[in-house]
Amino acid sequence: MDICAVIVTFNRLECLKKALKKYEEQTKRPKYLLVVNNNSSDGTMEYLKIWEQEQSEIQKVVVNLPCNTGGAGGFHAGMEKALELDCDWIWVSDDDAYPEPDALKSMEVFYDSHPSLQERIAAMCGTIMDYDKEKILLGHHCRSKKVMGVAIMKEVPEEE
């Protein structure tokens, strides 16, 4: 199973660095790691030029957008590029989402262990946990902020 992981980023270079490291540490690494830079102004473009040249068994692809198209626009650009690549699955993620080391392997194991369902499986997703991993976020439309070093999750009002 060849996977292309698409990560959309905007002005969160430190989050992006942490996310990229998490994909390098996967027990089942993606074939492609595709980063969509949503016109960041915090040094992300310069960092990605260097990152793209670093040796890795993962093929690195960077898409630099001329303007910030938001999350949806970034994922659209990433999916378009990913569909041009030789991969079986596309994994999408924000720059502040950090997959567990076996996330991609778990997806592969699930798919491979259910051959009778494979023709009907069009999408799979992981579980979204809060920062402390104490509970599953079912409606993960949340906002977080740090108070004295502790991440506090707060639901975003529906009107937002």
Predicted regions and their residues:
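Conserved donor NDP-sugar-binding/catalytic core segment of glycosyltransferases
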Residues: 102-138
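Short, acidic, metal-binding catalytic loop of nucleotide-sugar glycosyltransferases
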Residues: 21-30
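Short beta-strand-to-loop acidic/aromatic patch adjacent to the donor-nucleotide binding site
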Residues: 87-96
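A conserved acidic beta->alpha catalytic loop
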Residues: 37-46, 67, 97
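Glycine-rich, basic loop-to-helix element that forms the pyrophosphate-binding segment
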Residues: 65-82
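Cell-envelope/extracellular polymer assembly enzymes that use nucleotide-activated donors
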Residues: 2-4, 32
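Short, flexible, basic/aromatic active-site loop/helix in glycosyltransferases
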Residues: 143-160
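Acidic helix N-cap motif at the loop->helix transition within catalytic regions
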Residues: 42-51, 102
